[in-house]
Amino acid sequence: RGMEEAVGKSMALLMRVGIETHAHKFPGELSGGQQQRVAIARGLAMDPIAMLFDEPTSALDPEMINEVLDVMVKLAQEGMTMMVVTHEMEFARKVAHRVIFMDEGRIAEDAKKEDFFGKPRSERAQQFLSKILHH
């Protein structure tokens, strides 16, 4: 690839994750949410058929969490297959097709989104959701 093509693709990806105005900045000059969106853009640069996310919002300030989740919702709406480890249950309810609920390193429940959020089978999942979801 030529430099011009690489720069063009990079800018298009930064635009896709909403941080094109920060293209000239170094990582230390970006917020945690912006750094996470750069990481998503880097992943997208490989034209993947699926993306894996391990707690993508865990180290972020509460105000930055939605910036990252909004990008991930958009990716899901565009058809990107994603496997996401998260405690963000509202996000999971919005974009998941299937939920695997882990408890103490073991699968406690494996269900379709509607079943998991509607009527979880395991007592542990019921307890977790009652504490985390705001009805």
Features from the language model and the residues they span:
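Conserved ABC ATPase signature
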Residues: 26-30, 34
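Hydrophobic anchor residue at the start of the ABC signature
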Residues: 40
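A short, proline-enriched helix->beta-strand linker immediately N-terminal to the Walker B motif
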Residues: 45-49
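Catalytic Walker B motif of ABC-type/P-loop ATPase nucleotide-binding domains
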Residues: 51-54
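H-loop/switch region of ABC-family ATPase nucleotide-binding domains
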Residues: 86-87
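A short, surface-exposed alpha-helical micro-motif characterized by mixed small hydrophobic
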Residues: 92-94
